[in-house]
UniProtKB/Swiss-Prot annotation:
This is Large ribosomal subunit protein uL30. The keyword Ribonucleoprotein applies. GO terms for biological process: translation. Part of the 50S ribosomal subunit. CDD domains: Ribosomal_L30 (cd01658). InterPro entries: Ribo_uL30_ferredoxin-like_sf (IPR036919), Ribosomal_uL30_bac-type (IPR005996), Ribosomal_uL30_ferredoxin-like (IPR016082). NCBIfam families: rpmD_bact.
Length: 60
């Protein structure tokens, strides 16, 4: 199964609480943090919620 490399590129300071919670669920705490997750529907939904704050790459 493919994996997603998710990098936080923008601050969460002025974002809504549910978007902050989504970043925390992904394991991202500050700008520059990187996490690798399985490519599942749940993780895709998380990424879609905070797409303006993160950069996503598919890795094998």
């Amino acid at each position: 199964m493919a994996r997603l490399k998710i990098t936080q590129i923008k601050s969460k300071v002025s974002e809504k609480q549910y978007q902050r919670d989504t970043l925390r669920s992904l394991g991202l705490k500050r700008i520059g943090d990187v996490t690798v997750r399985e490519d599942t529907a749940q993780n895709r939904g998380y990424v879609r919620t905070v797409a303006h704050l993160v950069k996503v790459e598919e890795i094998d």
